[in-house]
Amino acid sequence: MNSDRTTLRRAHARDAVDAADVWLRSFSAALPTVRRAHDDDEVRDWFATVVVPRQETWVAVAAGSVVGVLVLDGEELAQLYLDPPWRGRGLGDRFVRLAQRRRPSGLSLWTFQINGPARRFYERHGFAAVERTDGLGNEEREPDVRYVWPSPPL
């Protein structure tokens, strides 16, 4: 599975369920100890009624299947999830470069503190951790960390 064989394109309404399913599989694989705040059907409904129609949503498509999803909400990189077999193949890098091109003035994002691979990934792409919380402000009640790009001056 080479990321060069994937197409990145804006999501259409018909992609909502497939994008949500990528989110569900990726979340479960990457964060097995984190309690999800919503069941599968609620996540699919959220993608269909909020994420795809109201936010700048991109999908990665390989052989006709959605294998990744990127969501930009204003200056926030709100979602970046890959089907587990597609991790480590450069697709996430392509999504981050796309987000940086789309928001050259800067991006911010939140990820869970427990998600070391995601944190290292964003740090490799020039994001800097600027805030940590105890998680009481997110639905999962999981300690999180806010990243910004470009990194603020020291």
Residue ranges of each PLM-predicted region?
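Short, low-complexity, intrinsically disordered N-terminal peptides in bacterial proteins
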Residues: 1-7, 151-154
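A short beta-loop-alpha structural element at the N-terminal edge
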Residues: 7-21
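Conserved GNAT-fold acetyl-CoA-binding loop/helix
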Residues: 20-49
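A short helix-loop-beta-strand connector motif used in the catalytic cores of GNAT acetyltransferases and
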Residues: 48-59, 76
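Conserved beta-strand in the GNAT
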Residues: 59, 65-81
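A short, internal acetyl-CoA/4′-phosphopantetheine-binding micro-motif in the GNAT/acyltransferase core
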Residues: 76-87, 111-112
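Conserved acetyl-CoA-binding loop-helix of GNAT-fold acetyltransferases
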Residues: 82, 88-101, 120, 124
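C-terminal "cap" of GNAT-fold acetyltransferases
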Residues: 105-119, 124-125, 130-154
